[in-house]
Amino acid sequence: MGTPVACGIDVLRADSFALLKAKRVGLITNHTGVAADGVATIDLLHQSEGVELVRLFCPEHGLRGTAENGIKVEDGKDPKTGLRVVSLYGESRKPTAEHLDGLDVMVFDIQDIGARFYTYIATMGLAMEAAAEAGIGFVVLDRPNPIGGHRVEGPLPGGELSFVCPHDLPIRHGMTVGELAQMFRAERGLDQLDLKVVKMDGYRREMWFDDTGVPWHAPSPNIPDLDSAIVYPGIGMLEFLNVSVGRGTKAPFRIMGAPFIDGAALAAELMAAELKGIEFLAIDFVPSKSKFVGEQCSGVRIRVTNRDRCQPLEIASAIAGHLAREHREAVLFDEKIGVLLNHPKTAERLQDRTVALNDLWEADEESFLRRRKAFLFYR
């Protein structure tokens, strides 16, 4: 490995925070907002001469990244700096005028993982809208897309946008947060927003996170490592079904099952499908949190054998098809499959194992690849 990638915060720091001098700053961040030497962006801005850090904002999972998914996060105070912390995953998901009072600029420094329904990008988009309405600036400190910027996968939304589907993106979008911010500004009509992206040094699109030399900080409690992040855009899509996706195990999103599933039969069917870059092993497990706590579950363990060939949405579609055929009522398939998938045509065809679902998405993927070109920073 060569010289590590310098993330946006490191580039800003090397320039003595010039972009923020004489500015009153509101910082949207969490535990992943750290420089290469492990110093938190909060502390760097708070200690920087000429930068006035006024207020902190946190996303889902809170400032320290310890709150479980879907649990409201309360406002609070940062014990180290004494600054007010405004939760953007509590009573408000979009900053209010009162939250932005007295600020000149908002700064966003959070590690995303590259999936449409991972909520940090929804938080960024709503904060950009609020900043535009308030007439203040917005700065994104860019970070790598952990699962690579060279691949996109999945359909564009076929239904209404929401907090878990915040923009017209495929499920695996292959963009950094800085690139997405550029797209959001252009496509949401935020022309009045003074947006600046502090780009990374040394980043290339084909990089996986462990190619960058940037230290890994688990972006949320159930994405402990890169392997979980790689399969998340697929297995995460099954989250609202009545199955365990491995929360409360040592391998979240790499284990899935339920008490009523025959893990051996599911593993055999999935291996027979010869999906690229992946193996399935039958497993029995007992989740310690989320669904089926303390219950014996049967299902599969997912092992990535070639991440460059692995297609997370293909994996999820094969599993969802089995569930639709064998356990439709038990998994609440008709009621829940569309929540994160947001593509009725795919939901309708999942149960037919003879259908190549990738064909449904090919036009969406190609049109998105063309559309995103104008917003890409890195080759």
Question: What is the meaning of each model-derived region?
Answer:
Residues 69-103, 115:
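Glycine-rich oxoanion-binding loops at beta->alpha junctions
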Residues 52-61, 141:
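Short internal beta-strands
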Residues 203-205, 209-280:
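Glycine-rich, aromatic-lined ligand/substrate-binding cores of catalytic
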Residues 65-69, 139-161:
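Glycine-rich, charge-decorated loop segments at or immediately adjacent to ligand/cofactor-binding or catalytic sites
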Residues 4-51:
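N-terminal phosphate-binding or glycine-rich loops at protein starts, especially the Walker A/P-loop
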Residues 161-234:
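Conserved anion/nucleotide-ligand pocket segment
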Residues 252, 257-360:
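Conserved functional hotspot residues or short segments at active or partner-binding sites
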